[in-house]
C-alpha cells in the first residue's frame, strides 16, 4: 500500500479452515487500517462452509470479499475449490449467488479462462457471475491446465470487457510484469485495471512505477541498494510484530532466499 497499490487482497484463506477456527487461517484475517481498502479472499466448494466463512470474514470488517475460483494448485483443485470449480460452472454460479445474497459487502471473483483449452467459456461465465450480483471480476489469462506455462491471453480477457452485456469492472491478471504491459492492458485493451501478484513479490515499488508510467509515461528508477535494505528491515520488523520473533524471522528468511527474491535482488 505504501508503494502505490490501490486495493489489496489478503492471501487466500480456506473456508473450511476458518470454520474449524484453524489458527493459521484466522491469523490471515488481520487487517490494519493503513491497508484499506482491503479485501479478504476465500476459497472453497461447499456452500454451507462458504456462507459460514462469509459471516466470520464480515466480523473483521474488510471492504470487500473476494472468491478465489482461480488457484490451480493441486491440493486446492482436488477438493473442487479454486480453479477446480471451473469443471462445475453451475456450482460456481450457485456459490457466488448465495454469497452475494448473504453478505452486506461487495463480492468480487478471481478466476481463470477455463479448465482447459476445450472448455474456455469465460464470456458466458462472466455474464452469469454479473447476473448474480458480483461487483467485479479479475481474470487470469490462462486455463487451469496451463498452470503458469505459456503466455497469459489478455485478448480473451478483453473479449469479456467488450461484451456489451458487461457493466461491471473487469481486471486482467497474469504476466503483467512491467509498466509497459500495464499500459497495454488499460489503453489498448480497454480493461478497467490489473491485478498484480507475482510481479510485486520482493518488488513493492512496482505499483508506483506502473502508476507513473500510466500517468505520463514517466519511468521511475529502480530502488537503490539502501532503499532495498531499508525495505527488507521494514518487512522483518512487520513480520515479527505480526507473527512473533521465531515465525516472523523464519518466514522473512524464506522469502528472501526464494527464487522470487533472487530476481528482486538482481534488479
Summary of predicted features, one role per range:
Residues 1-63:
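Glycine-rich, positively charged N-terminal anion/phosphate-binding segment
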Residues 8-10, 38-42, 65, 107-111, ...:
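Hydrophobic faces of well-ordered beta-strands that scaffold small-molecule active sites
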Residues 13-15, 43-45, 70-72, 112-116, ...:
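Active-site beta-loop-alpha junctions enriched in small/polar residues
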Residues 50-56, 120-125, 176-193:
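Catalytic cores of alpha/beta
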Residues 54-65, 69, 74, 79, ...:
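Alpha/beta enzyme core
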Residues 141, 191-207:
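Glycine-rich phosphate-binding active-site loops on the catalytic face of alpha/beta enzymes
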Residues 203-219:
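C-terminal helical cap(s) of enzyme catalytic domains, especially alpha/beta-barrels
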Residues 259-267:
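Single conserved hydrophobic/aromatic residue that forms the stacking wall/gate
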Amino acid at each position: 500500500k505504501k508503494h502505490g497499490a490501490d486495493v489489496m487482497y489478503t492471501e487466500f484463506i480456506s473456508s473450511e479452515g476458518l470454520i474449524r477456527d484453524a489458527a493459521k487461517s484466522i491469523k490471515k484475517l488481520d487487517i490494519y487500517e493503513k491497508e484499506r481498502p482491503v479485501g479478504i479472499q476465500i476459497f472453497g466448494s461447499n456452500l454451507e462452509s462458504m456462507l459460514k466463512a462469509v459471516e466470520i470474514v464480515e466480523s473483521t470488517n474488510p471492504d470487500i470479499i473476494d472468491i478465489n475460483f482461480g488457484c490451480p494448485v493441486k491440493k486446492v483443485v482436488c477438493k473442487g475449490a479454486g480453479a477446480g470449480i471451473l469443471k462445475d460452472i453451475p456450482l460456481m454460479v450457485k456459490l457466488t449467488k448465495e454469497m452475494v445474497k448473504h453478505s452486506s459487502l461487495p463480492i468480487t471473483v478471481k478466476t481463470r479462462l477455463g479448465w482447459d483449452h476445450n472448455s474456455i467459456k469465460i464470456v458466458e461465465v462472466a455474464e452469469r457471475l454479473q447476473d448474480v450480483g458480483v461487483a467485479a471480476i479479475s481474470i487470469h489469462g490462462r486455463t487451469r491446465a496451463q498452470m503458469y506455462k505459456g503466455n497469459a491471453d489478455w485478448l480473451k480477457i478483453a473479449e469479456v470487457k467488450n461484451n456489451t452485456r458487461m457493466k461491471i469492472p473487469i481486471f486482467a491478471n497474469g504476466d503483467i510484469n512491467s509498466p509497459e504491459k500495464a499500459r497495454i492492458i488499460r489503453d489498448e485493451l480497454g480493461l478497467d485495471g490489473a491485478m498484480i501478484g507475482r510481479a510485486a513479490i520482493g518488488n513493492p515499488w512496482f505499483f508506483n512505477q506502473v502508476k507513473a508510467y500510466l500517468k505520463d509515461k514517466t519511468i521511475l528508477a529502480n530502488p537503490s541498494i539502501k532503499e532495498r535494505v531499508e525495505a527488507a528491515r521494514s518487512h522483518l520488523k512487520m513480520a515479527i510484530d505480526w507473527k512473533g520473533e521465531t515465525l516472523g524471522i523464519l518466514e522473512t528468511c524464506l522469502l528472501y532466499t526464494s527464487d522470487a527474491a533472487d530476481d528482486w535482488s538482481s534488479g
